[in-house]
């Protein structure tokens, strides 16, 4: 079912669940004028097709004490170092996202820390000690005015 094409009902279901993943199928069924069974079948088909990959709860890092967010561009010593560098970065709790990119940086990561001092510790004692990394550039996040996912 890899080439499942979504229709307007699927789009509506996705938008509703992206807004609140805990919305009951019965409520969605009423909203779209179909049976709860239809909603269930559609959701299962989208799961099998890899369109729906899970449900999650969003938390506020700031409310949990993470006051410093940053993006770090990483230049590797060699392209062949990517798998091992990525494995080491993945082991760091402060690294919340990683991207393999084109352009100046080989890897771009998002890091969350409780303070500037904590960020400095992560940079000096964790990230910059990874042998495969040649250099880094850190961009501190001042605001996150737009945060959304794609529309189905």
Curated annotation (Swiss-Prot):
SUPFAM superfamilies in UniProt? Dimeric alpha+beta barrel, Winged helix' DNA-binding domain
Q: Which residues bind DNA?
A: 25-44
State which gene encodes it: asnC
Superkingdom field: Bacteria
Name the lineage. Bacteria, Pseudomonadati, Pseudomonadota, Gammaproteobacteria, Enterobacterales
Q: Tell me, what is one Gene Ontology molecular-function annotation carried by this entry?
A: DNA-binding transcription factor activity
Designated name of the protein: Regulatory protein AsnC
Q: What does this protein do?
A: Activator of asnA transcription; autogenous regulator of its own transcription; and repressor of the expression of gidA at a post-transcriptional level.
Organism, per UniProt? Escherichia coli (strain K12)
Q: Which SMART domains match?
A: HTH_ASNC
Q: Which GO terms describe its biological process?
A: negative regulation of DNA-templated transcription; positive regulation of DNA-templated transcription; response to amino acid
Record-annotated membrane-spanning stretches = none
Keyword annotations for this protein, in alphabetical order, are: Activator, DNA-binding, Transcription, Transcription regulation
Matching Pfam families: AsnC_trans_reg (PF01037), HTH_24 (PF13412)
Q: List the NCBIfam families.
A: PRK11179.1
Where the record annotates domain HTH asnC-type, the positions are 6-67
């Amino acid at each position: 079912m890899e080439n499942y094409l979504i229709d307007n009902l699927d789009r509506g279901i996705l938008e509703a669940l992206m807004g609140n993943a805990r919305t009951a199928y019965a409520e969605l069924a009423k909203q779209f004028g179909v049976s709860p069974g239809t909603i269930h079948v559609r959701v299962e088909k989208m799961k099998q097709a890899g369109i729906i990959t899970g449900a999650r709860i969003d938390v506020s890092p700031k409310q949990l004490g993470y006051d410093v967010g940053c993006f770090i561009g990483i230049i590797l010593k060699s392209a062949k170092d990517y798998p091992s560098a990525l494995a080491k970065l993945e082991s760091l709790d402060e690294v919340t996202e990683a991207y393999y990119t084109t352009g100046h940086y080989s890897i771009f990561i998002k890091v969350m820390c409780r303070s500037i001092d904590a960020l400095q510790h992560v940079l000096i004692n964790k990230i910059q000690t990874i042998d495969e990394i040649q250099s880094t550039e850190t961009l501190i996040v001042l605001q996150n005015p737009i945060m959304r996912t794609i529309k189905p």
